[in-house]
């Protein structure tokens, strides 16, 4: 491989928007879909709706419980909603991050730029969450035990008809309160580990995989409390009996007005431990998901820049 391809890879943050859009979209789909079953486990463990999985000792036991009771495909309910939302959201997310990082650092790398990496991640998150929040609402309602919706489209239509557009953004401020620190920690950690493992900042699959996994796991663990609050706001449903069919189903109930209501309810029902529900499942989901996301992003960024270099 000639030096030209490497030079183009290093210069990407300053000008190659189409590359970042394409690589980011592919990375988003991989990140959210590959480990999706554990995201379903996390949602059920964090929600205050009735769910047998809250009594399981580990996320793996919870996943097997869902499969045993509801079938192999049940943990994948809602994956199409998150895939549809994550591709445009991540395309803009990575593009904005790279452009902001290049602007704030002058396209230089190093520990001295840690705050610039964090600030770039925050700006990217504001745009990402505005696109992703409606998909997150649909996804989490589809993931719930006893969810009455047959498809993600049906879920979106029912939420809109019963609760209005506001329902899709009820948890937006909470999502930002979680994702702003998450992404700041995530990007600062990723760039830190890249500087340690890959000081020349060349394309290096192993360093991207390791740095991505470590960064995602740390950020996920530290922001789990706000993730619990977000899940409670997104899954405001109550269990009701259906005597005719001898089953339980979930009916939408708008009970929590915002972050403070959700925090008080979680604490009153579960105590302080309620804010760490789903931590293991969240980390299990996030470590490989973030590792794969960065690996795919860096791979396609490199491939697309290399192709561009040869075609010019």
Swiss-Prot record:
Give the UniProt record's GO annotations in the biological process aspect.
iron import into the mitochondrion
- Main subcellular location: mitochondrion
**Location in or out of the cell:** Mitochondrion inner membrane
On whether Hydrolase is a keyword of this UniProt record, the answer is: no
Q: Which Gene3D superfamilies match?
A: Mitochondrial carrier domain (1.50.40.10)
* Keywords noted in UniProt: Ion transport, Iron, Iron transport, Membrane, Mitochondrion, Mitochondrion inner membrane, Repeat, Transmembrane, Transmembrane helix, Transport
Family of the protein in this entry? Belongs to the mitochondrial carrier (TC 2.A.29) family.
What protein name applies here? Mitoferrin
- Organism of this sequence: Caenorhabditis elegans
Annotated gene? mfn-1
